[in-house]
């Protein structure tokens, strides 16, 4: 029988760590999976990759394999190794082959090492109003179950009731320990990560911890000043508009923005001047009177100047 070069099969170096080997294995397993690959030798390559992974993924077996490979050109080793000629060779036979060549003193009892499960990440949409207080949320997600080749064999649906804390922000990650995929050989489960996505709001834009709302004003409200009703996340308030307000001007409403553990933002009302519909004869005359009274005013006086 032939002692295969498992590192060459996996396209890795003997000095590579388990993470690198695992990445290579998953890539090759997907590439040569008989249900996916169109290559004529895909099934044979797939089995070869799986065989290499089963040995190299286990610390004890990998150490034994490295010792076998180191002695592969030793004549005495070859005589003993050839005794296994013709027998099927897989990872389970590996322990027996090693023992028959080196004896029981050359190896330790075989143990599979515990491995941590995979983390799962899901997006959770939250409305702006929901960020004001802690609230309960029922979430559903799927836990993948991997086969011996590292491919997803099936998915198990799971439902959890979770608490979304007050003051969450867009992109914030919330960890639910142990709610990911199960660990292997007694290893700990992976975690579930909730990634918060603040849903777009029809009125408010988010700027860090602050909020912005467009405030439509009639020209005379901006010119003369007024008290207008403005929406916030909790209720409507009366906002005083100072005389001579300009389009684009931001009026600060303190403490009406987004809250976090350390800071509460502000709400900014951004003024937008809204003209009335096409004026009738009477209204046009009034506009003309205003124009005559302000004939010296040129809004484009500084326009285009450095």
UniProtKB/Swiss-Prot annotation:
GO terms for biological process: chaperone cofactor-dependent protein refolding; protein refolding. It holds the Pfam family DnaJ_C. GO terms for cellular component: cytoplasm; nucleoid. Keywords: Chaperone, Cytoplasm, DNA-binding. Gene3D superfamilies: DnaJ domain, Single helix bin, Urease metallochaperone UreE, N-terminal domain. It comes from the Bacteria. It is found in: Cytoplasm, Nucleoid. The keyword Cytoplasm applies. The keyword Cytoplasm applies. GO terms for molecular function: bent DNA binding; unfolded protein binding. Residues 5-69 form the J domain. HAMAP family: CbpA (MF_01154). DNA-binding protein that preferentially recognizes a curved DNA sequence. It is probably a functional analog of DnaJ; displays overlapping activities with DnaJ, but functions under different conditions, probably acting as a molecular chaperone in an adaptive response to environmental stresses other than heat shock. Lacks autonomous chaperone activity; binds native substrates and targets them for recognition by DnaK. Its activity is inhibited by the binding of CbpM. This is Curved DNA-binding protein. It comes from Salmonella arizonae (strain ATCC BAA-731 / CDC346-86 / RSK2980). The lineage of its organism: Bacteria, Pseudomonadati, Pseudomonadota, Gammaproteobacteria, Enterobacterales.
